[in-house]
């Protein structure tokens, strides 16, 4: 994807996450996952635009005995300002997808806290760039 395509996808995901978190949907597990993928696309746009990096996945891999950094590594290295928020969104997204987290009555609260804190913090960082 190009930088512009990543930005377009990020904005699309941002709007979708808002809709998933309100009635009649209230699918907080998916809303949390989409919040994460919104920030992921801003991250990928940034890595491509500023460092010419296209991550191969979330986590590091090994190829011929050499460690290949993953997106999570690149965030810590190149975007330390949002690393904590990104990691929390990443973890929450994984829990939502693979552990069925956020399906119960507390799902709304978890979604709102992630949206209003970690997501808002990371999103504000990219808004400073006009994104």
Predicted feature descriptions by range:
Residues 1-131:
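Terminal alpha-helical segments
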